[in-house]
Amino acid sequence: TLSISHGQFGSIYASATLLSSFILIWIGKKIDDMNISKFAFYVVVLLSISSFLFSKISSIVYLFIAIFLMRLSGQGLMSHAASTTISRYFEKSRGKALSTSWLGLSSAEFVMPLTIVFLLTFIEWRDLWISISILVILTLPIVIFFTVKDVKLDTREETTFNNKIIEKIKQWKRIEVLKDYRFYIVCMTMLAMPWIATGSFVYQSFISSSKEWGPYVIAQSFMAYSILSVITLFI
């Protein structure tokens, strides 16, 4: 539609992602200043808006804005809100809870690629983005009612065990984290997979055409990726 090359799209995607990561540093900390449910509500609404914008792409500017909002609200703030909520909600079983919560993302990585490829065989891509936008908004009140209604963050686990007060985990400041060399060691291991996966996601069309693969090959690869992700979550 926009007559851009794979390389140009990759540059637009990378620029939008980089900008969203900088904005995430500022917006992400707002979750500490407001109700988590309200914060998550705004994030989901923004995700719906970004999905709708994809259906209206008519220029490179619109494409950049849509990718920026999608990366910020989707993989950025949605993951951030989920991890932050779980970390506050659990203390003794925090690691297990975080692993379980990520099953949602892995399940989506398993189901959605094949589903989207199938739907694109008889639904125009712009209509599909509109449908996704509507589905996100319609799902929101259901999720609120069944999962977070009247939930208090201090009700899941007791703060005492055998009449002993569990020591609180130290709350690090951002400057303390940046000064700790271990942070950069962890970053190298955590950033490797996202870089590799993002490259595969962005250039999946080019990879498929150059290898002469069918439309379902990449989608099936995502399914295998999600299965292995689930396995490693509990290792």
Regions found by a protein language model. Name each.
Residues 127-146:
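Symmetry-related core transmembrane helices of the 12-TM Major Facilitator Superfamily/SLC fold
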Residues 61-77, 191-192:
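Hydrophobic core of transmembrane alpha-helices in multi-pass small-molecule transporters
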Residues 175-233:
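Extracytoplasmic gate region of multi-pass secondary transporters
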Residues 76-90:
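Intracellular juxtamembrane helix-capping segments at the cytosolic ends
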Residues 148-172:
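Flexible cytoplasmic inter-helical loops of multi-pass small-molecule transporters
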Residues 11-29, 223-235:
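Central cavity-lining transmembrane alpha-helices of secondary-active solute carriers
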Residues 22-60:
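Conserved MFS/SLC helix-loop-helix module at the cytosolic interface between two early adjacent transmembrane helices
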Residues 91-114:
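Glycine-rich segments within core transmembrane alpha-helices of 12-TM secondary carriers
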